[in-house]
């Protein structure tokens, strides 16, 4: 069956960025964004997605325009693309909807300097978020982003004392025995042990064009021992020790070949309540997997097409 090319790379149906922003109007409205834009001969404003400074101002502007969030990023840190992060949040909304929860508590594993997932979850949905981060500079920026948006009542940024642990450090020190409804994670994609960690290709160039965006982020944010597969395997292992603390465990994956490896790892551990999805935004595709140790089947959510 041939898929409709028009919809092949479409975003989640509720993603506000399915309708492309009018960069010309936004450049008039936001001075800092205007200063990094390019003016075409037609008078239209264009955005150079391969320029890191431009991407930073674009992300900051879109967060302000669509969610009234005032966000800054640590120098050299990962610049989050809003469309992708929204796709992830919307997928979580879909899975949580059947539960009819009055209060939602989530964990953001590795929130980075932007703390974008926690900010979006809190601002958009009123979720209570625990943001875990191990890098000191990122922790400082994340806490400042929470403070400047007056979301301290909904978001706690927790400094991970040991980055080799996922939930362990927090759960061992947290006395209230809080239960969480989900965790999310954007793991380091690349294997730090590889001789060329950034040389891998996450796409099939014969079937899909290259992503437009320049790669951003520090080595610590982009690489870890064993890459994303090993990182998510650690989440799976810790999830088995915390079956009652988190209802739905999820993680994004940047490489399609990682998906069957994670599914096999879950199967080996007899975890069968599993669902997957794809996030499409422009020429970039990401994958995600969710699993639960509870008997209620996971909702697959709305697919991005």
UniProtKB/Swiss-Prot annotation:
Keywords: Methyltransferase, S-adenosyl-L-methionine, Transferase. The keyword S-adenosyl-L-methionine applies. S-adenosyl-L-methionine binds at residues 85, 110, 133, 164, 186. Transmembrane segments: none annotated. InterPro entries: DNA_methylase_N6_adenine_CS, METTL16/PsiM, METTL16/RlmF, SAM-dependent_MTases_sf. GO terms for molecular function: nucleic acid binding; U6 snRNA (adenine-(43)-N(6))-methyltransferase activity. It catalyses: adenosine in U6 snRNA + S-adenosyl-L-methionine = N(6)-methyladenosine in U6 snRNA + S-adenosyl-L-homocysteine + H(+). It is an enzyme of class 2 (transferase). Residues 194-217 are annotated as: Disordered. RNA N6-methyltransferase that mediates N6-methylation of adenine of U6 small nuclear RNA (U6 snRNA). This is U6 small nuclear RNA (adenine-(43)-N(6))-methyltransferase.
